[in-house]
Amino acid sequence: MMAFHYIFIALEVVLLFNLLIGVHELGHFLAAKWRGLKIDRFAIWFGKPIWKTKIGGVEYALGWIPAGGYVALPQMATMEAIEGKSDTPAEKLPPVSPLDKIIVAVAGPLFSFLLAVSFAFVVWGVGKPTTEGDNTTQIGWVDPTGPAWTAGLRPGDTILAIDGYPVKHFAPTSQDSVTWRIITSEGPKIAIKYRRDGQEKMAYATPYYHPTHWYERRSLRQILVAPAEPSIVDEVFSNSPAAEAGLTNGDIITAMNGQKIFSPFTIMSAVDEMSNGPVKPLTFTVQRGSDHFDRTVLARKPLEPTNSPPSLGIVAWLLDTNVSLVHPTPYEQVQSSLSQVFGTLGAVFSPKTDVGVQQLGGAVMIARVYYNLFQSPDGWRQVLWFSVLLNVNLALLNMLPLPVLDGGHILLSLIEVIRRRPVSARLL
């Protein structure tokens, strides 16, 4: 049954991804028909057609490679390499005015933007899931070997600003998030304004980069912290130390060895340290309903496999707790997406940040994100929200003045207006 579940999710990803590309290409197609351009082919998917038919001089085809689609427009020769080779030589057709070329090129991004707005209205109605960890800037865990700890940050501190920019949450869904501001920070030190015990303080952290192989893209800046969220036991192995101590599903651990904890990562880190040191008992303060009590758990190594590290027997922590639905307006969603796209482009082209073109994700990364979202609780709502951001990205990035993008076609058409003759195909 699990295999069918994964296959179904994969099919959802393929269909949704192709919907986004198909709508974009539909914009080009309808604009070309409106402006009277010759259309050889409107194809969904690539490769040799497994089905095709001709209606009104246009061949409609379905390829066998499920990765988008294209419109073959012989009068827009610069599109052939990207959107399919035409069967009709361009020189046998009447020329197309620069205005018509611009309209056809703009129509694709316009349809992507309209699809983003459509998704935004749906999200406004059904809501977007958000968790306690998404909506806080309080630190739940700090890696004791990381830059944040060295700079003086501790669990329970609340981050107020990064490099002078106020932050409102941890999740990198907008420019006012802790994660986003760390990733796009500039300079050798990251200035972090935080509050502890009612007092505002400053910390200066040296960014950390996760080691990568030569063939991998360079990792982005981190300070190795996690947001605060309740430590709720999701599942306990039977006959494990945790089970023998009386811990059960749904228990909330509020303190460890007398110290308040703000994240289950604190417990996991304490257990990990026992792999290279002595195994010490951990005393947890547990909240179960309205009751509060202490339980002491001594981790031990599982019998199988023999080289396993010590374990408490807690299979999983319920990280996505206190999930609620927010209903951002379409304007708020589109404005946030536009801001994030422009912010990303600014970071990519800035010589002062570590964000480069290599960090931008392609089709594989997009498919992976969709796959993970579909697997998450309320995944379909998350997918709708992400589709707003993705379509705004698709619309704006395609308007960049690069030859392989719609913006490149617009630029060439503007050059044609200035020169009063088309750009030579030998230059493209």
Regions from the PLM with identified roles:
Residues 123-161, 165-168, 218-255, 259-262:
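PDZ/PDZ-like domain segments forming the peptide/carboxylate-binding groove
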